[in-house]
Curated annotation (Swiss-Prot):
The keyword Oxidoreductase belongs to this UniProt entry's keyword annotation: yes
Alphabetical UniProt keywords: Flavoprotein, FMN, Oxidoreductase, Pyridoxine biosynthesis
Domain of life from the UniProt record: Bacteria
InterPro entries: Pyridox_Oxase, Pyridox_Oxase_CS, Pyridox_Oxase_N, Pyridoxamine_oxidase_dimer_C, Split_barrel_FMN-bd
Subunit-structure text: Homodimer.
Summary of the function given for this chain in its UniProt record: Catalyzes the oxidation of either pyridoxine 5'-phosphate (PNP) or pyridoxamine 5'-phosphate (PMP) into pyridoxal 5'-phosphate (PLP).
Cofactor(s) for this UniProt protein: FMN
SUPFAM superfamilies: FMN-binding split barrel
Protein name: Pyridoxine/pyridoxamine 5'-phosphate oxidase
Length: 218
């Protein structure tokens, strides 16, 4: 198959979106109410990793980066995720805390995008979550100097076994280089696929302490 044939095959990959629309009259006043409803439906539909979200950050040269992390908590203060504080995303957030999140619920023909500002979680919040994780995950947090270059996977595996032996008694301590971020919600956009590419998009945006809702063209 030639490169041109392959490109033609990709160009023709499409499907109709038929799972229903989204109407203004059905929207709650608060975006988190709709987010919670959609997240619950994603869980009920047994989607793989329904809490997985794309986190987009920008470096000091304006280059954007994206990666998938798991949402671990949300409330009116924002959406929470955890990471190695030496990671590329953590350094980029330190330089520019304005970030974007995206929940891609393809099987439900939905996506939710959040824009806002990330801020570090308190040590108490981080400690509570860290000790709720499986023990091997706690040890794994110690192993990796995230985003650094390594020569082989065996280095990580050997370090994991070494630390598992070291921490076999008592609690695994919280690494000083591990923490979390809360992303405030300045905007939240809900997208529902529609027939003939007439998708439904609604944007919630803060306006003098209240939420303004606008329909956007697809």
């Amino acid at each position: 198959m030639s490169d041109n044939d392959q490109l033609q095959q990709i160009a023709h990959l499409r499907r109709e979106y038929t799972k229903g629309g989204l109407r203004r009259r059905d929207l709650p006043a608060e975006p988190l109410t709709l987010f919670e409803r959609w997240l619950g439906q994603a869980c009920d539909a047994r989607l793989a990793d329904p809490t997985a979200m794309v986190v987009a950050t920008v470096d000091d040269k304006g280059q954007p980066y994206q990666r998938i992390v798991l949402l671990k908590h949300y409330d009116e203060k924002g959406l929470v995720f955890y990471t190695n504080l030496g990671s590329r995303k953590a350094h980029q957030i330190e330089h520019n805390p304005r970030i974007s999140l995206l929940f891609p619920w393809h099987m439900l023909e939905r996506q939710v995008m959040v824009t806002g500002k990330a801020e570090r979680l308190s040590t108490l919040e981080v400690v509570r979550y860290f000790h709720s994780r499986p023990r091997d995950s706690q040890i794994g947090a110690w192993v990796s100097k995230q985003s650094s270059r390594i020569s082989a996977r065996g280095i990580l595996e050997s370090k994991f076994l070494e630390l598992k032996q070291k921490f076999q008694q008592g609690e695994v301590p919280l690494p000083s280089f591990w923490g979390g971020f809360r992303v405030s919600i300045e905007q939240m956009e809900f997208w529902q696929g529609g027939e003939h590419r007439l998708h439904d998009r609604f944007l919630y945006q803060r306006d003098d302490g209240a939420w303004k809702i606008d329909r956007l063209a697809p």
